Amino acid sequence: MGRAYCGFIDVGYLRAQGSRACGIPGGQAQLQASACVDWLQIVLPHQAAGFAGLSFLRAYWYDGALEPHHAGSSEQRHVFDGIAFTPGVQLRLGHLAERRTNRLQRPIEQAMRSAAGDLGIGADELVAAFNRHWTWRPERQQKGVDTLITLDMVRLAQSGAFHTAVLLAGDRDLAEPVRTAQDAGCRVIVATVGGQASLAKELAQLADEVIEIPQDSLAAMVTGPTRSRPAQSRAAEPTEQ
């Protein structure tokens, strides 16, 4: 078995939990791929046990891509191209499904009408004013990302490509590939954002070790629009996500 370690980064998890931990609105959070590699290569070996004699192989970066006809696809492709040029990163893309829903709109409008009644003001006028200042955006959900993580982790573990896997994710569905990698003789460390509250219980129980990304490293990984930096110094394209 190779004396190497790999990172498996679920970008959806890092974006959601990282933006919350850093106090950045989710829609404004930009992920810095080069900072993630820095953490894996420089910080992690001093943070967790068992890295003596191990070399960093690469980080697999899992995200969802919009459909080619989507208005935001061109800009997203530009970002992905930059990430793909980041040294030490291999980009792996699932799909980003988008759907319009009134799942939140109805209960919010009902709450506003109740509040209007308590305040003695017109409910219709309040709701109409709110809708003039608020845009109901479609919900987005990653598809196929967990499958890609599963396939890569199992394939690489069974081929002996790595000794240790560092999984930055929290989904319960990833418990099975973790178990399979361990059965192949590999060690699996699960890295969390915000502690085990963001981690599925089964994943936490299976992990050989659970660690939390330090706040200073996290702040470099997840930046706001005014604090962003190039995701890596060798590529001409920006890689913030």
Please give the residue ranges for each predicted region.
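Domain-level signal for Mg2+-assisted phosphodiester chemistry and nucleotide/NA-binding surfaces
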Residues: 1-121, 128-138, 145, 183-189, ...
